[in-house]
Structures are given as C-alpha cells and as structure tokens.
C-alpha cells in the first residue's frame, strides 16, 4: 500500500463526497467499521491490523488531509485507539 497517495486528496470527487486515494478509502472503510462497533478488537480486522503495524506514523501525519462527507473517523479518538493498539502489539 502506497500511502503517499493520500497526498492526492481532493483530486477525485464523486457523488458520495471527497475522497483520497484507494488506500485512504480502504482505511476509511476499516476504521468506519471499527467505530460502528467500538468494542470490536482491531486485531479482528485485517486491514486495521496491517495499518496499525505498518503505517500508524504515516497516517498520523497525513490522514487529516483525507476526508469524506459521510465520515468523521479522522479524530483524536481514532488516533488514540490506533496508537494504543500499535503500541500494545
């Protein structure tokens, strides 16, 4: 996954709103799923697991550039949850 593509945020607009790269869409889907069920362990989601282990630092610097009109996952809560998970594992 090339998360540098998140820097292209805003170059694609569809009926659902503003999105970044495909990688950001994958992250959006995975984290939205996590937030819809806060008690669900991130380790049960392979995408979250992969992102937490490999890309937390990069996402913490860049994910604020990515947005969706239908999602508010880019929040302090998200960062705290993912950071805690990445530290514990």
UniProtKB/Swiss-Prot annotation:
It comes from the Eukaryota. One of its GO terms (biological process) is phosphate ion homeostasis. Keywords: Nucleus. The keyword Nucleus applies. GO terms for cellular component: nucleus. It is found in: Nucleus. It holds the Pfam family Ecl1. Induction: Up-regulated transiently when the growth phase was changed from the log phase to the stationary phase. Belongs to the ecl1 family. Involved in chronological cell aging. This is Extender of the chronological lifespan protein ecl3. It comes from Schizosaccharomyces pombe (strain 972 / ATCC 24843) (Fission yeast). The lineage of its organism: Eukaryota, Fungi, Dikarya, Ascomycota, Taphrinomycotina.
């Amino acid at each position: 996954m090339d998360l540098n593509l998140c820097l292209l945020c805003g170059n694609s607009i569809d009926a659902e709103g503003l999105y970044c790269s495909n990688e950001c869409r994958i992250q959006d889907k995975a984290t939205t799923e996590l937030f819809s069920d806060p008690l669900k362990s991130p380790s049960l989601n392979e995408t979250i697991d992969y992102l937490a282990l490999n890309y937390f630092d990069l996402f913490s610097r860049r994910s604020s550039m990515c947005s969706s009109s239908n999602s508010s996952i880019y929040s302090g809560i998200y960062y705290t949850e993912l950071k805690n998970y990445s530290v514990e594992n």
